[in-house]
C-alpha cells in the first residue's frame, strides 16, 4: 500500500512540477519576445528617420510625386472644402461616429496594442510582426507629422484660409498640416492590408481606413491637402519599415503549407485533387 501511495505522490509531484516549468517557460518566452520586439521597434523607427540618406533615384521620384500631388490638392483646397461640407448632412451618423472614434489616437493605440498583444500571448510571430510594423510606423510617422504641424503652422479651415500660416505656432488651430488622423488610421490600414493578396480584401481595408481621414473634411477640421499628405506619408513610412524588417530578417516564420485544389475528370470519374 505504501508503495502505491509513494508512486501516486511522485506522479502528482511530477505533473505539478511539469506544469510549473511549462508556465515559467511560457512567461520567460513572452518576456524574451517582448524584449526582442522592443529592440526591433527601436531599430525600425531609427531607420525610418535615417532612410532619406540612403534614397535612390526611385525614392526621389516618389518624393517628387508626393510633393506634386500635395501641391495639386493645395490648389483644390477651397473647392474640395465646399464639396465635403455639402455632403456632411447626407452622411449617416453611424459613419461619422465611426470616423471620429476610429481616428482618435487612443482608439488607434488600443487597436494596435490588441493586434500585437494577441500575437505575443499566442506566440504567433506573423501577428507579432504586424503589430511591430504598425507601432514602429505609427511612432515614426507620428513624430514626423507632429514636428511638421508645429513648424508649418497651417491654419485649420475653421480658423482661416488655406494659405494662412503661423510658423512654429503652439495654437491647435494652426496645427492642420498634415492630418494626424489620416496618418494614424492609414498607417494601420496599410500595414494590415499588406498582409493579404486578395484585391477585394485590400480594397475593403483601405475603404474602412479612409473613413476617418475623410470625416475630418466633413467636420471642417482639415484641408484636403492635409489629408492627402497624411495618407501618403503613412504609406511611405509603412513600406520603408516593412522593407527594413524584411532585409534584416527579423521575423522568420514558416508559412503554412497550402493545398492547391484542382478538378480532375476521367473515364466515368470526376473528383477534386489536392496537391501539397
Give the location of each predicted region:
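Hydrophobic cores of alpha-helical transmembrane segments in multi-pass inner/ER membrane proteins
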Residues: 109-115
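N-terminal signal peptide c-region/cleavage motif recognized by signal peptidases
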Residues: 13-15
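Alpha-helical transmembrane segments of multi-pass membrane proteins
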Residues: 69-79
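Alpha-helical transmembrane segments
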Residues: 63-67
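Membrane-interface helix-loop junction between the first two transmembrane segments
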Residues: 77-87
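Active-site microenvironments of hydrolase-like enzyme catalytic domains
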Residues: 118
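Perimembrane loop-to-helix junctions flanking transmembrane segments
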Residues: 85-97
Amino acid at each position: 500500500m505504501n508503495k502505491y501511495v509513494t508512486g501516486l505522490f511522485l506522479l502528482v509531484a511530477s505533473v505539478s512540477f511539469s506544469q510549473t516549468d511549462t508556465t515559467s517557460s511560457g512567461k520567460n518566452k513572452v518576456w524574451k519576445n517582448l524584449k526582442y520586439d522592443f529592440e526591433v521597434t527601436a531599430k525600425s523607427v531609427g531607420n525610418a528617420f535615417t532612410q532619406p540618406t540612403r534614397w535612390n533615384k526611385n525614392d526621389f521620384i516618389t518624393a517628387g510625386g508626393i510633393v506634386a500631388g500635395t501641391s495639386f490638392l493645395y490648389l483644390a483646397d477651397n473647392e474640395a472644402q465646399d464639396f465635403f461640407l455639402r455632403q456632411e448632412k447626407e452622411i449617416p451618423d453611424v459613419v461619422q461616429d465611426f470616423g471620429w472614434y476610429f481616428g482618435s489616437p487612443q482608439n488607434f493605440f488600443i487597436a494596435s496594442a490588441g493586434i500585437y498583444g494577441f500575437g505575443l500571448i499566442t506566440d504567433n510571430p506573423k501577428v507579432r510582426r504586424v503589430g511591430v510594423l504598425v507601432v514602429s510606423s505609427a511612432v515614426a510617422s507620428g513624430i514626423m507629422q507632429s514636428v511638421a504641424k508645429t513648424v508649418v503652422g497651417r491654419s485649420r479651415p475653421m480658423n482661416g484660409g488655406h494659405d494662412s500660416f503661423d510658423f512654429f505656432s503652439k495654437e491647435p488651430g494652426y496645427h492642420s498640416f498634415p492630418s494626424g488622423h489620416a496618418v494614424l488610421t492609414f498607417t494601420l490600414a496599410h500595414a494590415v492590408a499588406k498582409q493579404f493578396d486578395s484585391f477585394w480584401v485590400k480594397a475593403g481595408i483601405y475603404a474602412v481606413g479612409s473613413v476617418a481621414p475623410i470625416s475630418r473634411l466633413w467636420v471642417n477640421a482639415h484641408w484636403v491637402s492635409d489629408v492627402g499628405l497624411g495618407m501618403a506619408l503613412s504609406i511611405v513610412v509603412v513600406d520603408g519599415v516593412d522593407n527594413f524588417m524584411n532585409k534584416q530578417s527579423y521575423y522568420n516564420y514558416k508559412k503554412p503549407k497550402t493545398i492547391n485544389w484542382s478538378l480532375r475528370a476521367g473515364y466515368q470519374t470526376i473528383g477534386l485533387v489536392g496537391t501539397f
